[in-house]
Amino acid sequence: SINVSPINIEEAPILKPYLDLCQNLGKFGGQIIESNIKEINITFKGSVSKINTKPLISSLIASILSTKMESINLINAEVVAKQKNIEIITSFQDQTESHDSEISINLITEKEKFNFSGALFAGSSRIISINGMRIEAEISKNMLYTSNTDKPGFIGALGTELGNAEVNIATFNLGRTGSGEAVSLIEVDGKINSELIKKLENISNVKSIKKLSF
């Protein structure tokens, strides 16, 4: 049997924005990874570490797995993870570097590691870090994720291809390291088709391009 912690009336208003954040973070990570998950490592930092995190953990697991399989929900998520031999590790830290609360996830799959963090800003979900790169990106309905070598010309070429396809950029958020790696999260108006993704993958210095929906 699964131990899903019930949400009482008093804590519901506190948990609601965090449940939304966890759902968005789970969908984000699940859409990025490409191979079977072996481990989901979740760290709650700051104020969120002191509240009832059981439903948040279930929400994260359910959202990650639901991008790859059907009929996953808050009730059965941890059971399914166990059946799939996915190890769930949770940890808690009282302090955060720059936010009141932060949730960090490290996904380990058969072929890759992907870590990212999120936080709430005025009740809305934001991605604040991807693979150690700081970024500030509000999660929206249709987005594009890019990973690339940080060289001149990439952003211009990307913008040109999107413009040619009549895809409008609403927001553009960039994260980068000092060692030549960069990621971006781009909010776009409307959905991006697979044909356009193939064109974007041919841009110089691209490592990965993913269309995201939330």
What are the residue ranges of the model-derived segments?
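A conserved regulatory-domain signal marking ACT and ACT-like small-molecule sensing domains
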Residues: S1-F214
